[in-house]
Amino acid sequence: PKEKNGWALGTLSTGAIAGTLIAPSIGGALAQWFGMENVFIITGVILFITTLLTIFLVKEDFQPVEKKDLLTTKEIFSKMDHVSVLIGLFVTTLILQLGITSISPILTLYIRSLSGDTENVLFVSGLIVSIAGVSAIISSPTLGKIGDRIGNQKVLLGGLILSFICYIPMAFVQTPFQLGVLRFLLGFSTGALMPSINTLISKITPTEGVSRVYSYNQMCSNFGQVLGPMVGSTVAHGFGYSSVFLVTACFVLGNIGLSFFNFRKVLNKKL
């Protein structure tokens, strides 16, 4: 039911978040146990099993839209009451993925500079990346339910603020343990943002255009995944590893300002 969108999309988002954040450590372990070339075979088998499960177990009550009833992109946007909110959600998706992926090129090197331990640096890096997935798994469904009660826009803003608070001290940590604690807290932010974004999109978009709008949001997500490593490596090369977290925090701060501006009229309403 539509009133349970936050909980349902929160649970669904948990799988996507967990896969993105935990996969590096799983991939590293599999490569160590079975060899790097066999990781591709194992991944292919898992994807094949997932395909079969989707075909035979996922059922939906889908009513296709007649071709004559299909809306153009302009018509979809004209039927929306909160277009600026939607644009802001696209930006939030992009910034979220940029933040997650911007540290990818430098994380192992950053951890090595903190610890000086070259033997276990890959294991520790995988653990620190994955720990954010654990907290996201814990928090995502619960935060989705909270969003259903108090409004997903409030949960989204809370997630952005927590994200900003976590990124700043990451630039000044002295040990990998401190970085791991902050990454764990950052996972709660991720668990708040993804369900809130998806739920708000479903609520403000006309039924006839939901799939198309989600595809635009996915495009922003993919762009963030491409942009993140480029930004991270460029900033690290020019200003040092710590600067990556500060630059990411600046992106998040700008997103907070944009979100407050877009939500100013609906902050205390349930969309």
Region locations from a protein language model:
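Cytoplasmic helix-loop-helix junction between adjacent transmembrane helices
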Residues: 1-16, 200
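Residue-level signature of mid-helix packing/kink "hotspots" within the transmembrane helices
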Residues: 20-21, 133-141, 225-226
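Structural signature of the two symmetry-related core transmembrane helices
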Residues: 44, 154-169
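Helix-loop junctions on the cytosolic side of multi-pass membrane transporters
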Residues: 54-67, 261-271
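Short amphipathic helix-loop junctions that connect adjacent transmembrane helices
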Residues: 106-123
